[in-house]
Amino acid sequence: MSESWIVVGMAAVLGFFVGSINPATIIARTRHADLRQGSGNPGATNVGRVLGLRWGVVVGLLDVLKGFVPTFLALLLFDRLTAYVVGLATVLGHVLSPFLRGRGGKGVATSLGAILAVFPWFALGMLVVFGLLLWRTRWVAGSSLAAAGLLALYAGLAPLPDPVAAGRVWGICIALLVTIRHHGNIRAWAQRRLN
């Protein structure tokens, strides 16, 4: 194994560790709140339900930073491919946090942070689309899934910086991961439509 791949591997492990630190559960504990209430998800939306909007926004911003900082540092210190690996590892750490026995958050805000580091203009556009949909529908999960779909389209069709193939795979993987983490929301929506 070449030295460069060892560095990439170590950076990915560090990214996974940073991603696995869950601000939602830390803040909930300091506020003596139980995140098993609400949706039960250890993420910003549920913190907003349990502790109020202010704390939900704080957790959301911390999750965005958690995705942005490791990915941006990897881009700054190494290269775009390393940034993709670290960004994906950070999101995986968030959704599969060993500190939460593999039951982490849904990865939306952390993914946004990672995307902001490598595709900043697209990330801002995606955030606008998410915000408009949320304003119209008041449905966080649906707005998140629409943003994930937009990311998959962008990754698949847009002209990306080199390495192009890695960027396409990365974007589609992030979009799929967020979609899979929303399987319960998709199932609940489908049942409501059928009834």
Language-model region placement:
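N-terminal signal-anchor transmembrane alpha helix
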Residues: S2-T30
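Cytosolic, membrane-interface loops and tails of multi-pass inner-membrane proteins
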Residues: A24-G56, G104, R187-N195
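Short, non-helical or kinked segments that cap or interrupt transmembrane helices
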Residues: D34-G43, F99-L112, W139-L150
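Interfacial segments of multi-pass membrane proteins
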Residues: G48-L51, A74-F78, G93, V108-T137, ...
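Loop-to-transmembrane alpha-helix initiation sites
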Residues: F122-M126, V140-A148, D162-I174
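C-terminal membrane-associated helical module and adjoining short loops/tails
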Residues: V164-N195
